């Protein structure tokens, strides 16, 4: 419920910001802002099922007509059901159970961006560097096991912003790969240096 409420608030804020922007001819190309829905496919041994439970927020400022620096934060949750099996909790303890695994990722940091074309269509390439908080959890029977992890985060991205409307609000689409150094173990299953492929679609300002 908290995730859904957060998404509604973020979308409402984005629409209000776009409505209050000046006419397109007056929009400054010295900065950019994105609010995106995110589809994510994790690459790790703990959770590997794709989901659309994520969002991304970007802001940046152009140092030259082509090169920008900025900041980002995003979050994503991926879930996976695991059939019944014997899980060794310790050297002397084991349990036979199924699991509902969940992986929540929250990366944030700085962005370096190169804008290929400065026009209504603005394709770009970017590199994001920062830190990632990842929360691993597993529900079984009426119990829950979890682990908090931190790591270094890196993500190359390719995308495009399109500004078709007179109010200066546009559309944003991007594809990305991400990698982090997070490492954790829950219910005997290790997650070591997880990666992700994903796609973002949202609003650009």
Language model features with spans:
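Gram-negative (and chloroplast) outer-membrane scaffold detector with strong preference
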Residues: 58-140, 151-154, 162-167, 205
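Outer-membrane beta-barrel pore domains and translocons
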Residues: 34-42, 74-76, 128-132, 176-180, ...
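Outer-membrane beta-barrel translocator domains and adjoining extracellular loop/strand segments
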Residues: 43-51, 81-88, 135-144, 183-190
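Transmembrane beta-barrel outer-membrane domains
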Residues: 46-52, 99-105, 145-153, 190-196
